Curated annotation (Swiss-Prot):
Mg(2+) binds at residue 26. InterPro entries: EF-Tu_GTP-bd (IPR041709), EF-Tu_GTPase (IPR050055), EFTu-like_2 (IPR004161), EFTU_2 (IPR033720), G_TR_CS (IPR031157), P-loop_NTPase (IPR027417), Small_GTP-bd (IPR005225), T_Tr_GTP-bd_dom (IPR000795). Residues 19-26 are annotated as: G1. This is Elongation factor Tu. One of its GO terms (cellular component) is cytoplasm. Residues 85-88 are annotated as: G3. Monomer. Residues 64-68 are annotated as: G2. It is found in: Cytoplasm. Its main location: cytoplasm. CDD domains: EF_Tu, EFTU_II, EFTU_III. Residues 10-213 form the tr-type G domain.
Length: 405
């Protein structure tokens, strides 16, 4: 048998389950895979994952932070989904802030028996902060509630919560169902209304979460890792293409670490010592730049489509501060704390200039919003992830939520 080729015929979308502890996120992830694996959705495909397999999530490291994440994949008739589930509340916060697994849409799981709880709110707020663009709601455990009015009330509360954090609460699909009920129906070989609720959820995901713009279609950007001078030819910068396409002859800008961007032309592109006619996201390339001296460009800048990205010094960010057990600080920090901020390939000293009202200090293990001023401008945009380091160790991870200059 020849090996099956990964077919790129279906659109690819990244999703994940979010919500309060014990509201059934991992059970829902299991139910989705098992309903699809049972062949109950036309054109659907999956391997059935049991709850235990999802709950014992393997550890991953992202920006020096250990996170437990389970990845599953499945297909509907229209799409290929990559789906992430985290067992612990802290894992969610870390995943959302570090962007270890970025989501094009989230499935908010709310227990019909309990309604929205503190972590429900926290996850929705975080989803908004880190730019998760769409949310679909699965009201779980509806088999435990016989009171129609109570279900109406919980749905209303969830919609109000979403609206409060600037999601369109009135339009968001809310599916009533039971993940455990669906798994039990499958076991008894009698798919009924709870399996139907899982199919409804998949349909809502297909219809409501748009296919994201592909990295290839975005404006070109490559963080500069290294700079070489090649005698007789000029200056070459190397790095991995983050997004967009670069072709020889394209105009580019070198942005960051200097007051003004520098315009130049990419005269040739090489990968593995071979000349390329186009560089795509993920390619590790060397780019020969016209008329640029070795001292005009340095690691930490980015090569970008002109006008597509600007350098900034001041920003607001949502930050997760590592606990002592995770190798972070042992003591709190205060306003005027001055660590190193790592953006892509840039590492720049910055000062924490503002903490939230009423917050005097930030403890290891906290998740906090703060304002930072860098000593040199860096190519920044909302949604960009960064690490905070001090004395050679990672002490935090963050995401830019607003540019302030």
């Amino acid at each position: 048998m020849a090996k099956e080729k990964f077919e790129r015929t279906k659109e690819h979308v990244n999703v994940g389950t979010i919500g309060h502890v014990d509201h059934g996120k991992s059970t829902l992830t299991s139910a989705i895979t098992c309903v699809l694996a049972a062949g109950l959705v036309e054109g659907g495909k999956a391997k059935c994952f049991k709850y235990e397999e999802i709950d014992k999530a393997p550890e991953e490291k992202e920006r020096g932070i250990t996170i437990n994440i389970t990845h599953v994949e499945y297909e509907t008739a229209k799409r290929h989904y990559a789906h992430v589930d985290c067992p612990g509340h802290a894992d969610y916060i870390k995943n959302m802030i570090t962007g270890a697994a970025q989501m094009d849409g989230a499935i908010l799981v709310v227990s019909a028996a309990d309604g929205p709880m503190p972590q429900t709110r926290e996850h929705v707020l975080l989803a908004r902060q880190v730019n998760v663009p769409y949310i679909v709601v699965f009201m779980n455990k509806c088999d435990m509630v016989d009171d129609e009015e109570l279900l109406e009330l919980v749905e209303l509360e969830v919609r109000e919560l979403l609206s409060k954090y600037e999601y369109p609460g009135d339009e968001v699909p809310v599916i009533r169902g039971s993940a455990l009920g669906a798994l039990q129906e499958l076991e008894q070989n009698s798919p009924g209304k709870w399996v139907e609720s899982i199919k409804e959820l998949l349909n809502a995901m297909d219809e409501y979460i748009p296919t994201p713009q592909r990295e290839v279609d975005k404006p070109f950007l490559m963080p500069i890792e290294d700079v070489f001078s090649i005698s007789g030819r000029g200056t070459v910068v190397t790095g991995r293409v983050e997004r967009g396409v670069l072709r020889p002859g394209d105009e580019v800008e070198i942005v960051g670490l200097r007051e003004e961007p520098l315009k130049t032309v990419a005269t040739s592109i090489e990968m593995f010592r071979k000349v390329l006619d186009e560089a795509l996201p993920g390619d590790n390339i060397g780019v020969l730049l016209r008329g640029v001296g070795k001292d005009d460009v340095e690691r930490g800048q980015v090569l970008a489509q002109p006008g597509s990205v600007k350098a900034h010094k001041r920003f607001r960010a949502q930050v997760y501060v590592l606990s002592k057990e995770e190798g972070g600080r042992h003591t709190p920090f205060f306003v005027n704390y001055r660590p190193q901020f790592y953006f892509r390939t840039a590492d720049v000293t910055g000062t924490v200039v503002k903490l939230p009202e009423g917050v005097e200090m930030v403890m290891p293990g906290d998740n906090v919003e703060l304002e930072v001023e860098l000593i040199a401008p860096v190519a920044l945009e909302e949604g960009l992830r960064f690490a905070i380091r001090e004395g050679g160790r990672t002490v935090g991870a963050g995401v830019v939520t607003k540019i302030l200059d």
